[in-house]
From Swiss-Prot:
ATP binds at residues 30-33, 51, 87-91, 415, 479-481, 495. Together with its co-chaperonin GroES, plays an essential role in assisting protein folding. The GroEL-GroES system forms a nano-cage that allows encapsulation of the non-native substrate proteins and provides a physical environment optimized to promote and accelerate protein folding. The gene is groEL. The keyword Phosphoprotein does not apply. Keywords: ATP-binding, Chaperone, Cytoplasm, Isomerase, Nucleotide-binding. It is an enzyme of class 5 (isomerase). This is Chaperonin GroEL. HAMAP family: CH60. It is found in: Cytoplasm. The lineage of its organism: Bacteria, Pseudomonadati, Pseudomonadota, Gammaproteobacteria, Lysobacterales. Belongs to the chaperonin (HSP60) family. Forms a cylinder of 14 subunits composed of two heptameric rings stacked back-to-back. Interacts with the co-chaperonin GroES. One of its GO terms (biological process) is protein refolding. The keyword Disulfide bond does not apply. It comes from Stenotrophomonas maltophilia (strain R551-3). NCBIfam families: GroEL (TIGR02348), PRK00013.1 (NF000592), PRK12849.1 (NF009487), PRK12850.1 (NF009488), PRK12851.1 (NF009489).
Length: 549
């Protein structure tokens, strides 16, 4: 086992604080409407230019192992806030730096670290309650657009396109962000349930202009096995033909005689049919077929539930207002399923989302919710260069997460004002002893740090602005973009409550751990290995010159 380098007390904390300051100073330069960019070197290709706090934090590794531990712990604040709320990483870093710096000074002055931590925790709990009390729900598209604009560094076009996307697919709908091919941002909306499987034969096409198979008011057969024998399908086909409606078949596979018969019937106009493969694989395929059954009011024909294809009737089929099948995608629009059953299915999937620890599974489950609840919107980000594209895509991602958080828990006045108002409301808060009181004061001072940093990045004097904001009430604050004082809600400067709350809670959590750290252990640097000696002593072999070769 390698030797360890161990540091104690003030020596350990001071090194840790140095690491915190290096990382936080790099990250906080990006805060606010006049925050600066940070350029990140990449191992290959052009460097990345970003104003995204968590992207900056993730790139930082320090040479000194003890300083690096401090930096990595603050990086955890940014990452956790990003995971919880999708935004607010820079605010969380600024709060953590202020708490750690002041906390370390108090410990060095002889105060009890545990009491300081208890004081900080007490202040944070009270501040979170105050934030919740001043929070306002996001009632309209305008508020959603404003939140998106602020999070995208005051880019109104990004805020507006996110508001448009939410309006189209609903607040439960999935909105994805992709790199576009043009210079402008574009919004592409798919309503209904779409999955990535197309027609199994081009002979099913009935709309030559769009090269799609369009079915109006069709029946929908859902089967979890292969269909190769046409005899199994006859009862269903006869029932559909009598009803005079088209039919969509979604099965694991439709092949051989069955596919050929369906094509012939379609060409002759006897029954209008389109066959597609079921999406997904294994258990995910079964779940998606079940989703389609709920959406269309049908039943999955499966031996697992005692149903066989040859005994299926028209009552087992789903219905929808319209189905469109292209070469690569199938879209089911306006399924006739019971709304209560759909809502119940959505609630069930949401429970699975909360329980899963896999990001991939969570993403797939969220897609299923969207397909049941409303639809999918794709924001295609436009830019003139690849570097600009990456930077802009990061901002759109941030803005999207912020708007989702705003819809979830409401909004508070932005620009650091909400935290300053929380400080005013907690003026009379007291702890069990003087050290706890000092911890409370550390937390209250730290809550002013985001506003101070926003003002400093705008080139103004922080103390003057902060004092003027503290003199005001409600949503009165400072608009750093224009240099004006006024009502932040009227300026359209809003922060999601969830983002501000997560930033404060995560910063306090890590700060409490660092203040109460008394020892640090790291691997000792390896000393250079000495060169191998002794090989030079073979000179005596020169006496072998008399040997014949």
């Amino acid at each position: 086992m390698a030797a360890k380098d161990i540091r104690f007390g003030e020596d350990a904390r001071s090194r840790m604080v140095r690491g915190v300051n290096v990382l936080a100073n790099a990250v906080k330069a990006t805060l606010g409407p006049k925050g600066r960019n940070v350029v990140l070197e990449k191992s290959f290709g052009a460097p990345t230019i970003t104003k995204d706090g968590v992207s900056v934090a993730k790139e930082i590794e320090l040479a000194d192992k003890f300083e690096n531990m401090g930096a990595q712990m603050v990086k955890e604040v940014a990452s956790r806030t990003n995971d919880d709320a999708g935004d607010g990483t820079t605010t969380a870093t600024v709060l953590a730096q202020a708490l750690i710096r002041e906390g370390a000074k108090a410990v060095a002055a002889g105060m009890n670290p545990m009491d300081l931590k208890r004081g900080i925790d007490k202040a944070v709990v009270a501040a979170v309650n105050e934030l919740k009390s001043i929070s306002k729900p996001t009632a309209d598209d305008k508020a959603i657009a404003q939140v998106g604009t602020i999070s995208a560094n005051s880019d109104e076009s990004i805020g507006q396109i996110i508001a448009d996307a939410m309006k189209e697919v609903g607040k439960e709908g999935v909105i994805t962000v992709e790199e576009g091919s043009g210079l402008d941002n574009e919004l592409d909306v798919v309503k209904g349930m779409q999955f990535d499987r197309g027609y199994l034969s081009p002979y099913f096409i009935n709309n030559q202009q769009s090269q799609t198979a369009d079915l109006d008011d069709p029946f929908i057969l859902l089967h979890d096995k292969k269909i190769s024998n046409v005899r199994d399908l006859l009862p269903v086909l006869e029932g559909v033909a009598k009803a005079g409606k088209p039919l969509l078949i979604v099965a694991e596979e439709v092949e051989g005689e069955a596919l050929a018969t369906l094509v012939v019937n379609t060409i002759r106009g006897i029954v209008k049919v389109v066959a597609v493969k079921a999406p997904g694989f294994g258990d995910r395929r079964k779940a998606m077929l079940e989703d389609m059954a709920v959406l269309t009011g049908g039943t999955v024909i499966s031996e697992e539930v005692g149903l066989s294809l040859e005994k299926a009737t028209i009552k087992d089929l789903g219905r929808a207002k319209k189905v469109q099948v292209s070469k690569e995608n199938t879209t089911i629009i306006d399924g006739v399923g019971d709304k209560a059953a759909v809502d119940s299915r959505v609630a069930q999937i949401k429970t699975q989302i909360q329980d899963t620890s896999s990001d991939y599974d969570r993403e797939k489950l969220q897609e299923r919710v969207a397909k049941l609840a409303g639809g999918v919107a794709v924001i295609k980000v436009g830019a003139s260069t690849e570097i600009e594209m990456k930077e802009k895509k990061d901002r759109v991602d941030d803005a999207l997460h912020a708007t989702r958080a705003a819809v979830e828990e409401g909004v508070v006045p932005g620009g650091g004002v909400a935290l300053v108002r929380a400080v005013s409301a907690l003026a009379g808060l007291k702890g069990a002893n003087e050290d706890q009181n000092h911890g409370i004061q550390i937390a209250l001072r730290a809550m002013e740090a985001p506003l101070r940093e926003i003002v400093a990045n705008a080139g103004e004097e922080p103390s003057v602005i902060v004092n003027k904001v503290k003199e005001g009430t409600g949503s009165f604050g400072y608009n750093a973009a224009t240099g004006e004082f006024g009502d932040m809600l009227q300026f359209g400067i809003l922060d999601p409550t969830k983002v501000t709350r997560s930033a404060l809670q995560n910063a306090a959590s890590i700060a409490g751990l660092m203040i109460t750290t008394e020892a640090m252990v790291a691997e000792a640097p390896k000393k250079d290995e000495p060169a191998m000696g002794g090989a030079g002593g073979m000179g005596g072999m020169g006496g072998m010159g008399g040997m014949d070769f």
